[in-house]
Regions:
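Calcium-binding acidic motifs and repeat modules
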Residues: 2-234
Length: 234
């Protein structure tokens, strides 16, 4: 797929409520927290627009939502270091995170593996197999490690500076989708994943994936992916 032009408008609505009693101490990047929390959170995203491709015009309207309610007591010691990998949902929804199961992976590529959350079924990390060994070795091969912003990292590969990653960009054939869930694991090219184009425009979409007070991941930004056949998703 090749994109000639596009116009997209985003609307986001985020609501959260929290009551808590906390005691926090911090030393350097280490944060110790003891807290009693009542939390609720909801996110609604809407994208409307048109995309001009060589095959014709795609009119898109995407609506997605996430919500949660939770009460918990928490004591934690956390090392705060933000890495924002890009995730593609093959079914077109927002990124899905498994808040129960984790796996060992060196996400910040410092030579030490951490326990991070698996993705939900039908979701995958956007990656580049830099050493062509057929596996994703660590976070250095996942978009989002370099700057902490996956969209900013991806924009570096926009050869024609049109705000789209598609077949006109040399990186397109190198990009992979690494899907790793509790049910399956594998690596797909964008073509095999039926991904036609990735739009670099994005919208702030803060949402926390938590389970019994444990923060497993945070959704920070969302953008639009176009699949072959004209279907659009987040």
């Amino acid at each position: 797929m090749r994109i000639d032009a596009y116009s997209i408008a985003f609307t986001s609505q985020y609501e959260s409520a929290q009551s808590s009693l906390s005691r926090v101490s911090q030393k350097g990047e280490m944060v110790h927290t003891l807290s009693l929390h009542n939390e609720s959170e909801s996110l609604e995203l809407l994208a409307r627009g048109t995309v001009m491709t060589q095959e014709g015009v795609v009119d898109l309207e995407l609506l997605a939502s996430l919500s949660r309610k939770e009460r918990y007591v928490q004591e934690s010691l956390v090392h705060q270091s933000a890495i924002d990998p890009l995730v593609i949902n093959f079914e077109g929804g927002l990124a899905g995170v498994d808040t129960t199961n984790k796996f060992s992976f060196d996400l910040n590529s410092d030579g030490k593996k951490e326990m991070i959350s698996l993705l939900g079924s039908g979701n995958g990390f956007l990656a580049i197999d830099k050493n062509n060994n057929g596996i994703i070795d660590d976070g250095s091969e996942i978009l989002g490690k370099k700057s902490g912003d996956g969209f900013a990292d991806l924009a570096l590969y926009d050869d024609d500076r049109n705000g789209v990653i598609d077949e006109n960009d040399s990186v397109f054939e190198k990009l992979l989708v690494w899907h790793k869930s509790a049910l399956d694991e594998g690596i797909l090219t964008l073509k095999h994943a039926r991904v036609g184009a990735l739009l670099l425009d994005n919208v702030a979409s803060m949402f926390h994936y938590k389970n019994e007070g444990e923060s497993n991941a945070t959704l920070q930004k969302s953008g639009v992916v176009l699949f072959e056949g004209g279907r659009a998703g987040w």
